[in-house]
């Protein structure tokens, strides 16, 4: 059966010498794996059209199991995401988070909206690292956990100025008054905890101007990755490349 669906490529894996397996997130919020024959060959014209983040109309044959890609009518290549290794790596982290949050057969229209929002924000100049944090905050529940950043997990104190870190012992933010009860709590700036709470709760259509200091973004990114490792056992391939890039700069 010949299918036509708009979507965004969220995963691309080389298969053999000349083929690729791509996964698109279609406009209905479903993952669609497709075999792209000879996509690594320049002459087929599919090499550029099967890159990560390509948004287009995908035409493919679908019977049982994996479909076979025929062609792509590209709407946007998202070129700006490919121009900088850090930008493309954090965008890939966002895409990987969404892809891994979904099981086969899941339908999640919000994930499609989230991905489109994030890619557009990155292209318009918003920090790709910050956008990866937004995605990971929004996807937490799909990985089976949540995190509270606006009150002390020990005392219930919700005075934001008193919160100084995150406690894995008590599974939540911790205040300076209770800090002695967990000497291994991850110390965070008060602003980091405040912004994590805001971004976690704020609908994406209300996120207009997102100008946050890089040190705060780094803190948010680090604690979010720790939460995913601790609570969901998740290690992201995209993050490995980011770590390698950071080591090269040292």
Curated annotation (Swiss-Prot):
Domain of life of the organism encoding this protein: Bacteria
InterPro entries to which the protein is assigned, alphabetical: ARFGAP/RecO (IPR037278), DNA_rep/recomb_RecO_N (IPR022572), NA-bd_OB-fold (IPR012340), RecO (IPR003717), RecO_C (IPR042242)
Gene3D superfamilies: Nucleic acid-binding proteins, Recombination protein O, C-terminal domain
GO cellular component: bacterial nucleoid
Keyword annotations from UniProtKB, A to Z: DNA damage, DNA recombination, DNA repair
Keyword Magnesium listed: no
Transmembrane residue ranges: none
Pfam family, one: RecO_C
Keyword Membrane: no
Any single biological process term in GO: double-strand break repair
Family, similarity comment: Belongs to the RecO family.
Function: Involved in DNA repair and RecF pathway recombination.
UniProt-recorded name of the protein: DNA repair protein RecO
Organism of derivation: Staphylococcus aureus (strain Newman)
Name of encoding gene: recO
């Amino acid at each position: 059966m010949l299918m036509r669906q708009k979507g965004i490529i969220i995963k691309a894996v080389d298969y053999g010498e000349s083929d690729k397996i791509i996964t698109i997130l279609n406009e209905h919020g479903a993952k669609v794996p497709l075999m792209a024959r000879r996509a690594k060959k320049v002459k087929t014209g599919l090499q550029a059209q099967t890159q990560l983040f390509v948004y287009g109309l995908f035409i493919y044959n679908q019977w049982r199991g994996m479909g076979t890609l025929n062609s792509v009518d590209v709407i946007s290549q998202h070129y700006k995401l490919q121009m900088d290794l850090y930008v493309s790596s954090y965008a890939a982290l966002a895409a990987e988070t969404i892809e891994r949050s979904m099981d086969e057969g899941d339908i999640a229209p919000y994930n499609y909206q989230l991905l489109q929002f994030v890619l557009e924000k990155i292209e318009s100049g918003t920090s790709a690292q910050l956008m990866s944090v937004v995605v990971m905050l929004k996807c937490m529940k799909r990985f089976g956990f949540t995190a509270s950043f606006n009150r002390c997990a020990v005392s219930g104190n919700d005075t934001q100025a008193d919160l100084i870190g995150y406690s894995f012992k008590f599974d939540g933010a911790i205040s300076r008054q209770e800090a002695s009860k967990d000497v291994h709590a991850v110390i965070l700036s008060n602003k980091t905890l405040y912004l994590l709470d805001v971004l976690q709760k704020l609908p994406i259509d209300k996120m207009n101007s997102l100008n946050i200091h890089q040190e705060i973004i780094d803190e948010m990114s680090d604690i979010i990755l720790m939460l995913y490792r601790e609570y969901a056992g998740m290690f992201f391939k995209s993050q490995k490349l980011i770590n390698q890039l950071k080591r090269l700069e040292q």
